[in-house]
Design a protein with these regions (language model features):
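A non-catalytic alpha/beta surface segment that caps or lines the substrate-entry region
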Residues: 42-92
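N-terminal capping segment at the start of a domain
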Residues: 22-51, 63, 177, 262-269
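Sec-dependent signal peptide recognition
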Residues: 2-9
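Acidic/histidine-rich catalytic neighborhood of metal-dependent amide-processing enzymes
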Residues: 79-85, 110-204, 235-238
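Structural recognition of the beta-strand scaffold that forms the well-ordered cores
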Residues: 33-35, 88, 99-103, 147-150, ...
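N-terminal signal peptide c-region/cleavage motif recognized by signal peptidases
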Residues: 13-17
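Solvent-exposed loop/turn segments at secondary-structure junctions
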Residues: 39-41, 60, 75-79, 93-96, ...
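Active-site-adjacent substrate-binding region
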Residues: 189-305
């Protein structure tokens, strides 16, 4: 065990004790395991991916949800195809209520040049957050049906979310909430909510009602605005993660993320480079957003981006 890793463990223990709740402790435990050697970088169609799914099944099986797998194939070259597996956790009793699809991709880059790419921020943070939300919201009363989807093969083309979104009837889905890269260590205590432009006025009361003193949710409605706020390169944030697959199928979205990460797709994307207290506060802010949606009854939301 390296000194740096030992210090990281101490940091996690201190931070989780400050929050007290067993749910918050589990959130950090999940993050730590998802970005560990045991899951070998979580690359699609590898032993690491299989180990990840086994862990996710074991966690989701503890909740009041029906857990299933969705296998899909996609082109991985001119003449080759590959297979991915999404994990879907839905209420045990289906209703006629509109669905909110909460997504996070669990795949990453695996092993390259003899080194594992652990993908702590990308996207163990999103997956651990989804597990937390599935647990904390499972017995809450909502005017909508919450469905949790852990997508595969996002890194090489959003393939898992493309397949899943195409199976949906957009008339039955209120929105997608996508969680990707929630642990960027920055000085501002802010998480960005990149949102379909059509939701700007409709979700304004929700964002206004939020009152989280540790983390501010900043609504953003264009890639240009997002790039300006985070002082990043010219990234098309509307197409940067799984939320784009839903937009392509006429389903509006809110994408929660922290912006550009200097350790993105490097071996330095580890738990040691995540601000744990800020990450936990970010997940709690997102939880607050979803709970606030329960106070607003939307019959339909247009998916124009």
């Amino acid at each position: 065990m390296t000194i740096k890793y030992f210090l990281c463990l101490i940091l996690i223990c201190v931070c989780t004790n400050s929050y007290g709740s067993a749910l918050h402790t589990q959130l950090v435990d999940d993050l730590n395991h998802l970005a560990s050697n045991a899951l070998m970088g979580r690359k699609t169609a590898t032993e690491g991916a299989a180990n990840t799914r086994a862990y996710l099944h074991s966690r989701l099986s503890k909740f009041n949800l029906n857990v299933s797998e969705q296998t899909f194939t996609y082109k991985s070259g001119i003449f080759e195809h590959a297979q991915g597996i999404n994990i879907i956790a839905a209420p045990t009793k289906s209703t006629q209520r509109k669905k909110i699809i909460i997504t996070a991709h669990y795949d990453h880059l695996g092993k390259r040049g003899g080194k594992y790419y652990f993908g702590a921020n990308d996207n163990a943070t999103g997956v651990a957050a989804l597990l937390y939300l599935a647990s904390s919201l499972q017995n809450k009363e909502f005017p909508y049906e919450l469905v949790f989807v852990l997508t595969d093969a996002e890194e090489n083309g959003l393939h898992g979310s493309k397949h899943f979104a195409q199976t949906l009837n957009s008339n039955n889905v209120l929105m997608n909430i996508n969680l990707d890269m929630l642990g960027v260590k920055k000085h501002k205590s802010r998480v960005y909510a990149l949102t379909s432009y059509s939701l700007k006025q409709k979700l304004k009361p929700v964002f206004t009602a939020l009152n989280n003193t540790k983390i501010t949710i900043k609504p953003v409605y264009s890639s240009k605005q997002m790039n300006r706020l985070i002082k990043s390169q010219n990234i098309d944030w509307h197409k940067a993660s799984d939320h784009y697959s839903f937009a392509q199928n006429n389903i509006p979205y809110v994408y929660f993320g922290m912006g550009h990460d200097p350790h993105h797709h490097t071996t330095k994307d580890t738990v040691q480079h995540i601000d744990i207290p800020k990450y936990v506060s970010t997940v709690l802010a997102i939880e607050g957003f979803i709970k606030q949606l329960a106070h607003h009854h939307y019959d339909d939301l247009n998916a124009e981006t």
